[in-house]
């Protein structure tokens, strides 16, 4: 006998805040009149729902009930409870560069001043054993990405590979576009690799990660990411944490702990807190082209803008003009929709004829800019990428103000100290996800992710 539920019992049905874009699917059945909801029984039509999180999951649309439970275990309140009973574990904190920039802008500090205040509040007040940036994790992520791409190119495999460090995009592909999964590179993100490195330095730690995106919480909760990150907070939540504890971040500048004291043995603090050339979403596309340029002396890099601000293509050209390698940056759901169509839907003959009619006398020219045709695509769910993450301190701004803020943060990102990512000189453990299509569920308590 099935249990009867009302709408108020289903935690996917809540008051209007952020409406989902569309129902997952529509089921056409005979009208059975007004009935109580039953477990396992879908209504006539999948209704639009709202998510109960204060902020949406970095453009990933609706979330399932089970995911909301996971997110509830990653709040600043949960962190405080864990921190107060941490002994005998030690606290380790990793901070993404986008989070540092957002916090610095919010508090009216330079990034260097913000880093001092963070070392003070995390090292002095919270007693953190380690406080690190995520660049070392990014370095390993980029190196392993490049190695896989070069191996694939040497084997003559055609078609693009997609970066999988954005959990919003990964969730979307695994849940709603399983055909994308074979295109996805399974190298882990800097967040997870940094966590693995910290646990290698001291297995008895509690790892808090400050990330620009709410979806990073779900990434940390993946089965293939177990024990790498214990809790993820966004800059918004970190500010809420400070407010709850009535802490003035500025006051901790005088209590700053030297970064070297908060760095694990064997780590170079300069690497940990620096950045590298490329986009403010990790620079994966540009770093691949730089890597290929080292393998082809005399080659040059040409960067071309796409049809909108969230499309960019980097090309490596031989002295003769021959294309040696290409990589694209593709951000935002509209561009991801186009990517899905190009990868999963064959082009029609009619569209090709239309192009020929429009350009009957076209002279030979280089291929048109299209990141979707590149060897490798740096895909991010958020428009403008990680520098516009849903967890950053950018709420309440209109579109124009938000664009201005993104521009300011990108300028700040470009001013971060940079180091070249070297060619790997030693054997590394592989840091990989177990990417797989996730079967849809008919459970009435679950609403699958849909943008």
From Swiss-Prot:
[4Fe-4S] cluster 2 binds at residues 166, 213, 382, 386. GO terms for biological process: iron-sulfur cluster assembly. GO terms for cellular component: cytosolic [4Fe-4S] assembly targeting complex; membrane. Pfam families: Fe_hyd_lg_C (PF02906). InterPro entries: Cytosolic_Fe-S_CAF, Fe_hydrogenase, Fe_hydrogenase_lsu_C. GO terms for molecular function: 4 iron, 4 sulfur cluster binding; iron-sulfur cluster binding; metal ion binding. Keywords: 4Fe-4S, Iron, Iron-sulfur, Metal-binding. Signal peptide: none annotated. Belongs to the NARF family. This is Cytosolic Fe-S cluster assembly factor NAR1. It comes from Eremothecium gossypii (strain ATCC 10895 / CBS 109.51 / FGSC 9923 / NRRL Y-1056). The gene is NAR1.
């Amino acid at each position: 006998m099935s249990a009867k539920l009302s709408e108020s019992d289903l935690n996917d049905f809540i008051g209007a805040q952020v409406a989902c874009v569309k129902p997952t699917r529509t089921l056409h059945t005979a009208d059975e009149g007004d009935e109580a909801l039953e477990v396992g029984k879908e209504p006539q039509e999948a209704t639009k729902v709202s998510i109960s999180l204060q902020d949406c999951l970095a453009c990933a649309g609706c979330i399932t009930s089970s995911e909301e439970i996971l997110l509830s275990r990653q709040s600043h309140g949960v962190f405080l409870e864990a921190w107060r009973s941490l002994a005998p574990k030690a606290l380790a904190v990793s901070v993404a560069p986008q989070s540092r920039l957002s916090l610095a802008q919010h508090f009216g500090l330079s990034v260097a001043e913000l880093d001092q205040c963070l070392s003070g509040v995390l090292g002095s007040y919270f007693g953190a054993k380690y406080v690190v940036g995520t660049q070392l994790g990014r370095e390993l992520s980029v190196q392993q990405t490049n190695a896989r791409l070069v191996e694939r190119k040497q084997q003559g495999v055609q078609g693009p590979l997609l970066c999988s460090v954005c959990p919003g995009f990964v969730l979307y592909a695994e849940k709603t576009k399983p055909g994308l999964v074979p295109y996805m590179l399974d190298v882990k993100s800097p967040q997870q690799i940094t966590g693995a490195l910290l646990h290698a330095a001291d297995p008895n730690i509690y790892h808090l990660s400050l990330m620009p995106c709410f979806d990073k919480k779900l990434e940390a909760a993946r089965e293939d990411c177990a024990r790498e990150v214990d809790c993820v907070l966004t800059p918004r939540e970190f500010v809420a944490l400070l407010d709850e504890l009535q802490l003035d971040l500025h006051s901790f500048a005088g209590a700053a702990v030297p970064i070297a004291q908060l760095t694990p043995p064997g780590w170079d603090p300069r690497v940990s807190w620096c950045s590298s050339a490329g986009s403010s979403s990790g620079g994966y596309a540009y770093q691949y082209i730089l890597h290929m340029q080292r393998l082809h002396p005399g080659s040059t890099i040409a960067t071309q803008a796409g049809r909108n601000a969230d499309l960019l293509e980097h090309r490596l050209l031989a002295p003769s003009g021959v294309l040696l390698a290409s990589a694209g940056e593709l951000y935002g759901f509209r561009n991801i929709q186009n990517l899905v169509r190009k990868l999963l839907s064959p082009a029609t003959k009619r569209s090709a004829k239309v192009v020929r009619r429009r350009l009957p006398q076209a002279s030979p020219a280089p291929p048109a800019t299209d990141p979707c045709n590149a060897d490798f695509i740096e895909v991010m769910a958020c428009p403008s990428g990680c520098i516009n993450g849903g967890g950053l301190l950018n709420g309440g701004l209109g579109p124009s103000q938000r664009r201005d803020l993104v521009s300011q943060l990108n300028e700040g990102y470009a001013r971060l100290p940079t180091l070249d990512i070297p060619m790997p000189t030693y054997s590394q453990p592989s840091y990989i996800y177990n990417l797989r299509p996730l079967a849809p569920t008919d459970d009435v308590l679950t609403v699958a992710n849909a943008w």
